[in-house]
Amino acid sequence: MAAMNTDAAVLAKEAANFERISGELKGVIAQVESTGSALAAQMVGQAGTAAQAALARFHEAAAKQVQELNEISANIHTSGTQYTSTDEDQAGTLASSMNI
């Protein structure tokens, strides 16, 4: 079995990238919702109903994406912490068994 090397700093950086993407997506969501709200008074009839339904579907999908990005970021943070902790624990166990 091949050894797996991890770098907690790299994992933290990648988690931050997911957080950045999530933040950018939230900004886009806000812009789309703002535009939709501004146009709501002018959207009447079937076209208005269809446009509002499309905006609702967009919001649902975008919110799901934000949730997924946040979960990925949290999982990466947790993994980095666990890898570091496990590495330190194993190093301590090895040092103890070798009386170092």
Curated annotation (Swiss-Prot):
State its location(s): Secreted
Q: Does the keyword Secreted apply?
A: yes
Q: Which SUPFAM superfamilies match?
A: EsxAB dimer-like (SSF140453)
Indicate the transmembrane segments per the record.
Answer: none
Q: Which UniProt keywords apply?
A: Secreted
What are its GO cellular component terms? extracellular region
Q: Does the keyword Secreted apply?
A: yes
Give the phenotype of cells or organisms lacking this gene. Increases efficiency of DNA conjugation when disrupted in donor strain. Loss of detectable protein for EsxA and EsxB.
- Region of interest called Disordered, as start-end residue ranges on this chain: 80-100
Q: What else is known?
A: To improve expression in E.coli the proteins were cloned as a single protein in the (non-native) order esxA-esxB with a cleavable thrombin tag. DNA conjugation in M.smegmatis is unidirectional with distinct donor and recipient strains; mc(2)155 is a donor strain while MKD8 is a recipient strain. Mutations in a donor strain that alter DNA transfer do not always alter DNA transfer in a recipient strain.
Q: Per the similarity annotation, which family is this?
A: Belongs to the WXG100 family. CFP-10 subfamily.
Q: What does this protein do, in the record's words?
A: An exported protein. Plays a role in DNA conjugation, in at least a donor strain.
Q: Describe the protein's quaternary organization and the partners it interacts with.
A: Forms a tight 1:1 complex with EsxA. An artificial EsxA-EsxB heterodimer interacts with EspA.
Protein name from the UniProt record: ESAT-6-like protein EsxB
Instruction: Give the originating organism.
Output: Mycolicibacterium smegmatis (strain ATCC 700084 / mc(2)155) (Mycobacterium smegmatis)
Q: Which gene encodes it?
A: esxB
